[in-house]
Regions:
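Gly/Pro/Ser/Thr-rich low-complexity, intrinsically disordered segments predominantly at protein N-termini
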Residues: 1-190
C-alpha cells in the first residue's frame, strides 16, 4: 500500500499548482503540462515530478514522448510540492535536473509556506528573484507569472489574476508567435 498523501500538505497545493500551470497552457498553443508523469532523464534517473510544463516536441521542445508513453529528456520546467521531502528535492533532485538540462525548477515548501524557483544559468541553477511587485516571472515561459505569496495562502483568484496579467504582455504574444513559427518550420521539413 502506498504512503498516505495528505490533503493540506500535498493534495490541495498540488491542485493549485496544476490549476496555475493548466491556465497558462490553455492560452499558450504549443505548450503541454503533465501531472505525475514519469520522465526518463538518463539511465539512472526516471523521476515522477508533481508537475511539468514543456514546449511540445512539434514546437521545438527539448523532450519527447517515447513509444512507451514515458517522457524522454528534460521538460523545460518541473514543479514539486514538498512537505517532508524538501531537503531531497532541494539537493539531490536539484542536481539531477541541472545535469540533465531542466531549465526551471520550482519547489513549493509547504510547511515553510515558501516557493523557491530556480533557473538554469551557465549549467548552474540559480534562484530566480521576485520582481519589485513580489512576483516570479519565468524566463523559459514568457508570461508565466506567479504571485507566490497568494499561492501559499490559497488565494487562487489572485494567483490567476496575476497570471492573466502576464498572459496579456507582448512577451507572451511574441512567444506564441515563435512557437507557431517553429511548428510551421518543422511541418515543412516532414
Amino acid at each position: 500500500m502506498q504512503a498516505a498523501v495528505r490533503f493540506e500538505q500535498h493534495g490541495r497545493p498540488h491542485s493549485d499548482l496544476m490549476t496555475w500551470l493548466g491556465n497558462y497552457r490553455a492560452v499558450t498553443p504549443g505548450v503541454e503540462v503533465g501531472d505525475n508523469t514519469t520522465i526518463r532523464l538518463d539511465q539512472d534517473n526516471e523521476p515522477q515530478p508533481d508537475a511539468f510544463l514543456r514546449i511540445a516536441p512539434s514546437h521545438g521542445g527539448q523532450s519527447r514522448t517515447g513509444d512507451d508513453g514515458v517522457v524522454d529528456g528534460p521538460p523545460e520546467l518541473i514543479a514539486k510540492v514538498a512537505a517532508s521531502s524538501a531537503s531531497y528535492d532541494l539537493h539531490d533532485k536539484l542536481n539531477v535536473y541541472r545535469r540533465n538540462g531542466v531549465r526551471e525548477y520550482i519547489v513549493w515548501k509547504v510547511l515553510e509556506r515558501e516557493v523557491v524557483w530556480f533557473h538554469l544559468c551557465d549549467e548552474r541553477f540559480e534562484q530566480l528573484q521576485r520582481d519589485d511587485a513580489g512576483l516570479f516571472k519565468s524566463e523559459a515561459f514568457p508570461g508565466l507569472w506567479l504571485d507566490s505569496a497568494n499561492l501559499v495562502a490559497g488565494e487562487m483568484a489572485q494567483v490567476l489574476q496575476v497570471l492573466q496579467s502576464g498572459l496579456t504582455t507582448s512577451d507572451h504574444a511574441e512567444f506564441v508567435v515563435r512557437l507557431q513559427q517553429e511548428a510551421d518550420k518543422r511541418a515543412e521539413k516532414s
